[in-house]
Amino acid sequence: MKFFIDTANVDEIKKANDMGVICGVTTNPSLIAKEGRDFKKTIEEITTIVDGPISGEVKATTVKAEDMIAEAREIAKIHKNMVVKIPMTVEGLKAVKVLSKEGIKTNVTLIFSANQALLAARAGATYVSPFIGRLDDISMDGLELIRTISEIFATHAIETEIISASVRHPIHVTECALAGADIATVPYSVIEQMTKHPLTDQGIEKFKKDYEAVFGK
């Protein structure tokens, strides 16, 4: 399973990229707004840091297929690695069909059911993004959704990749890998948590003390 980082914070992207663990970035209107920066300038800077798929979403106010298509074409011009995030709606599917034929990569977002994922894949989506944390929030099983989509795609040889989104903690990451997700897009805070274990800290401290006992500080 591959890792993308889910943020528009350039400093976080740099830190994660320096670890050598991420191969892409996902953003959304909320993440861009949180940074208080211009969308295009932010995306352009991100493309100079990570050489991999960069998802930029059409505006939340864009609801008609023709408008999504026009906006997606502009986003795709920013860089060769751009992937356009399109919401899972009827109009969104219409846009994905056209964009796919034009060779523009798409990431259909806000997926909450296997049927939605299947429709998006058949429309030509490069990626689908099921939101597991938000399903967990309403007492549904987000990870079961990943398993179901993965099984359907494998059964029918569907090449659309599954991006596990709304990942809240390291256990989500492990379970997504087991469930068959191709990619997990995670916040920087989760990446940090994944690097840590109390026994690792204890082991490092013991090695340090043992060394200092013999050789001094």
Swiss-Prot record:
Pathway: Carbohydrate degradation; pentose phosphate pathway; D-glyceraldehyde 3-phosphate and beta-D-fructose 6-phosphate from D-ribose 5-phosphate and D-xylulose 5-phosphate (non-oxidative stage): step 2/3. Its EC number is 2.2.1.2. It holds the Pfam family TAL_FSA. GO terms for cellular component: cytoplasm. Gene3D superfamilies: Aldolase class I. One of its GO terms (biological process) is pentose-phosphate shunt. It is an enzyme of class 2 (transferase). PANTHER family: TRANSALDOLASE. Transaldolase is important for the balance of metabolites in the pentose-phosphate pathway. This is Probable transaldolase. The gene is tal.
